[in-house]
Amino acid sequence: MQLACREPIAKGLHITHWSSDDLARQAMVDGIVETISPRTVRQILHEVDLQPHRTRYWKTSRLDALFKKRAERVLWCYGNARRLAARGYWVVCVDEIPNFQILERRPIRRAIPGSIEHQEFEYTRHGTINVLLFLIVHTGHMELAVENKKDANHYFHELAAFRRRHRGLKGVFLIQDGDPSHTAGATHAYWSKSRWWRPRFTPAHASWLDQAELLIKAFGSRYLKRTSWESREQLIEHLKVSWPEYNRLYAHPFEWYWTNHQMRQWFARHAAE
């Protein structure tokens, strides 16, 4: 196990990471064991839950005063979403699925007893679309729009359309990440015309605070995977009928337990590291 936790360069090797074959060979070279097979190495690694052959990307959030301020404002909205809704103010999260590929595949072989579903690997591309999703936090309901282009002009055009659909509201607290279309001057100019929109930004590299990311996963797994579209128009029509069905069958407020109190405790622990 100690060998697997060391970098290969420590043993004079220029490979970037260990495989079970490499570890077996090096263990014998170092005299740790007289003989050992890669299979036995894999069993040992499995027992201690060590996976030197795997990696995962991550990005450290910058824990500064701006992070804390933005997180507090977002979490306050989540904690008060129902109370605000009763007063005529919605908390709405927004996010995009950019450049979603429109892929046409051969007919799927549906699952039968003893055989899982099979999907043809080859496909024909029919371009991409940009999908904008709105999540109404206190109900879990969603709305969806297709943007012809992912930029500020198309973004605030869809914001204006959302406002027209909900003109009876007093205002919206809009949770969003720091995407360029969200932070552009044209978008801020649109917001400045009225207090109806009350934008709240997630901290840099902390878009996971936007509950719309949960919606993308919940909606996408049911309506965007394991299927095929012959054209852009066919996919758009599919989306038009899919999001109302999602609201009818699956929508519910997402469970969110991270409060401002918990965030401040977490911040105090990690900001000092």
Spell out what each predicted region is.
Residues 118-124, 193-211, 227-229:
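RNase H-like polynucleotidyl transferase catalytic core
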Residues 169-183:
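Acidic/histidine-rich, metal-coordinating catalytic segments
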Residues 176-178, 200-222, 235:
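RNase H-like two-metal-ion nuclease catalytic core shared by retroviral integrases
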Residues 2-10, 17, 21-125, 272-273:
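Charge-mixed, compositionally biased segments that are often intrinsically disordered regulatory tracts
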Residues 104, 234-273:
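C-terminal domain-tail junction helix/linker
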